[in-house]
């Protein structure tokens, strides 16, 4: 969580600068991102890509829907990166995590290799914040989508 500010005075500012915590807002707790994909190769690739691209994330992995939903129920998750093409159905996970698309429990980014516009439209209609194709997405693209999704959900929660 970013430092919210306050009156530190000159000594506090000096210490903050010495520790690399000044100006306020520079120090943040990493967001917890859960990557869900039944393909072990894709799961490792995207999890490692996020870890290597940015220290902003604590990345968790799940290879199936049941374990993913248990993880989401047992600890705070800031964003989910979800493959829809899984034996248990990625849409099932999406609907569990976003029962009301106007106020999602957690932002969900769909990351799939299936290039079907109707699939993306259906995912967004059911609450996905963004839909990305694996074959044309970089770690930077995914990072940007995660940041935008978390900001959008935070704004929606604040407005309600």
Model regions and ranges:
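The C-terminal output helix
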Residues: 146-160
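Two-component/phosphorelay signaling modules centered on CheY-like receiver
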Residues: 40-60
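C-terminal output helix
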Residues: 118, 135-146
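Short amphipathic alpha-helix used as the core "switch/output" element in two-component signaling
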Residues: 70, 91-104
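As written
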Residues: 77, 90, 122-130
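Conserved phosphotransfer microenvironments
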Residues: 65, 81-97
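Active-site residues of response regulator receiver
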Residues: 37, 82-83, 112
């Amino acid at each position: 969580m970013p430092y919210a500010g306050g009156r530190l005075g000159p000594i506090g500012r000096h210490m903050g600068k010495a520790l690399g915590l000044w100006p306020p807002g520079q120090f943040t707790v990493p967001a917890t991102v859960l990557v869900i994909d039944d393909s072990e190769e894709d799961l490792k690739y995207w999890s490692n890509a996020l870890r290597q691209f940015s220290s902003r994330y604590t990345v968790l992995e799940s290879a199936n829907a049941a374990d993913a939903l248990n993880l989401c129920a047992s600890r705070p998750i800031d964003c989910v990166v979800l493959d829809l093409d899984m034996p248990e159905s990625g849409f099932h996970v999406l609907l569990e995590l976003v029962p009301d698309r106007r106020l999602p429990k957690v932002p969900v980014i769909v990351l799939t290799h299936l290039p079907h516009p109707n699939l993306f439209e259906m995912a967004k209609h059911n609450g996905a914040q963004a839909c990305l194709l694996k074959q044309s997405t970089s770690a930077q693209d995914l990072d940007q989508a995660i940041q935008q999704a978390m900001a959008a959900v935070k704004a929606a929660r604040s407005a309600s």
